[in-house]
Each structure stands twice: as structure tokens, then as C-alpha cells.
Amino acid sequence: MGNRRLALLIFVLFFLTGFTNLSAQSPTIEPSEKQLSTGEPFIYKIEPDAKGGEAYKLVYLVPVPIEVLWRFKTDFHGDFLETNKYIKNQRVIREKQNVVIIENRLSSRLGSKFRWRNILFSNKYRLDFVLENPEQCDQKFHYGHFQLEPLGAHTKVSHVAYFDFFGASLWAYYPWEGGMYAFLDYIARWEQETILKVKDDYE
């Protein structure tokens, strides 16, 4: 048996016996400015929704001003989106005032079309999102928000999400590629790198 397979078996056994039943952090948990300045993403498992499931908070620093990052994050038509390895394709279904409905296909579930309602609060640099068709995506619910805050000439991003689906807890604790931590680490680093390539379009 290979080392990776053995480690996975041990992890699953620990998971099934309650080894990973660790206390979740408060949603208000934050890294310090000094920690953020390293450029590293900070990932926290936070208290879940009262209905159950799992939740996370991802906090990271992006090296552009807040207005530039806000335009970038709310550009749902951008070609750059499909450079993200987890997004196969995306299209905008409807836009009305501060609400944008998008549909995308993810590499992890090519057979499902995820339809997201995004509510933009431009004066607060906040974007709320909710999965409108959870049953079609084998989920019970999935919602959260992005909050941007200026930090000098850079922007602090706080990404919070609450979700539930079969295997959600296993995904949340899985420590390798394919688990929550690897996914969120990639998302943050992809955004940090991608905005630098296209920022001239949003200045």
C-alpha cells in the first residue's frame, strides 16, 4: 500500500471515529495586518449554520486598491474567469440593478450547472451570494459573502461561506488536493496573481 493511500486510510478512520470533531472558530476571527502582509491566505473553519453543514472564512490581501479589485470581482463577463482551474465556463443569465444571476460549470461537477444569485452593495464593497438551485447540484444550501476593506494601497478580502452537501465534513477536513483547504488556498492565490495581469483594465 502506498504512503498516500495509507495516510488517506488513517485519516478516514480518524474522521469516522470523531478525531476531526474539532471546535470551530468564531466568524469574527481575523489574521493580524502583519500576517496579512506576508501575502499568505488564512483559512479558518468557523461555526456552521444552525441548519448544520460546514462553514469557512478565507482572508487574504490583494496588492491593488479597493476600487480596482471591486471592479475586477464584479466583472462577471471577464474572460479571465476561465483561467481558474475550477471554472469550466460561466455565463451571465440576468442583471437587474444590483443583482446579477450567473450560471457556471465547475471542474469537480461537470454534470451540474450552478446558478448563483449575487447581490452587490457597491457603497460597502460587499457581495452576497446564494446558490439558487442547490438540489440540482446535490447540495442542501450554499451561501455567503465577500467583504473588501482597504489596507493602505492594498485590499483585504474576507470570504465567508456556509454550505451543506453529502460529504461536506469530509471535504472540509481533507488535508490534500481536492479538499477545502487546497481549494481555498488556490482561489486566493489565483486572484492575487490574476488581478496583476489584468489590473490595467480596471483602473
Briefly describe each language-model feature range:
Residues 45-46, 101-108, 129-136:
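Short beta-strand segments that buttress and anchor functional surface loops
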Residues 1-9:
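Bacterial N-terminal signal peptides that target proteins for export
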Residues 192-203:
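Short, highly charged C-terminal tails/helix-capping segments
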Residues 22-95:
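Hydrophobic ligand-binding cavity/cleft-lining segments
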Residues 9-18:
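Bacterial N-terminal signal peptides
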Residues 132-182:
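Beta-strand/loop substructures that line and gate deep hydrophobic ligand-binding cavities in soluble
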Residues 81-121:
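Mid-length scaffold segments of soluble, non-membrane domains
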Residues 57-60, 90-91, 113-120, 143-150:
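Hydrophobic/aromatic beta-strand elements that line small-molecule binding cavities or substrate pockets
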